Amino acid sequence: MIKTKSKIIDVAKGLFREISVYKATMNDIAKAAKMSRRTLYTHFKSKEELYKYVVEDEVNAINEKLQKAADSRLPPDRKLKLYILQHFGVIDSLTRNNRYIRYDFLFNNIRVEHLRKEIDKKEISLLTGIIREGKERGVFRVTDPKVFSQNLLLMFKSLEQAFILTGHKERNSKTVLEYIDLMFFGIINTENSNLHHG
């Protein structure tokens, strides 16, 4: 039973990637999985439900990668930098390899928000842990780690669409590093700033 369900999810993932979630039908999926439509509908009531499971599969892979970054033994500031790079790396590989998810990220924000609820909860929890550790060690100057983490995630999301549209891996990496520097050190060059003169 579980094997059959996993097989359907894998086949659907491949088909959605190949011909898009909008064009693939339940009939196409049944044929590609070499099973009857009846068997397919025993496991999934609709294509929309199957799509949810396909994305859930991707979400689990994302959560594992983010968890690894959060669990690293680096100091809090370096851990946060690693985490941010991992976040955007995951978005890049997810949208680069999956046209159907890329389309949703770019044009269907409501569905993306629905699909990302679980990732968001996980991310806020992981980020809060990193920020709290940094605050306790005196590395980060923040009042409320959880609120700061929620705002940080909103900032990430505001950058994602431009990041996906650019689609240039090297340029995107440079942009993310610039944002990390901006967040960590600000935009002011203290040596030349008038704020520090008189």
Q: Which residues does each PLM region occupy?
A:
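Short secondary-structure transition hinges
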Residues: 88-128, 136
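C-terminal peripheral helix-coil segments that are non-catalytic and often amphipathic
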Residues: 82, 89, 125-137, 154-155, ...
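Helix-turn-helix
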Residues: 7, 11, 15, 19-49, ...
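Hydrophobic alpha-helical connector segments
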Residues: 53, 67-93, 149-152
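Short coil/turn segments at alpha/beta junctions that flank glycine-rich nucleotide-binding fingerprints
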Residues: 18-22, 73, 94, 137
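Secondary-structure edge/capping motif, primarily at the C-terminal ends of alpha-helices
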Residues: 69, 98-105, 163-166
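Short, basic, alpha-helical segments at the C-terminal edge of helix-turn-helix-like DNA-binding modules
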Residues: 56-63
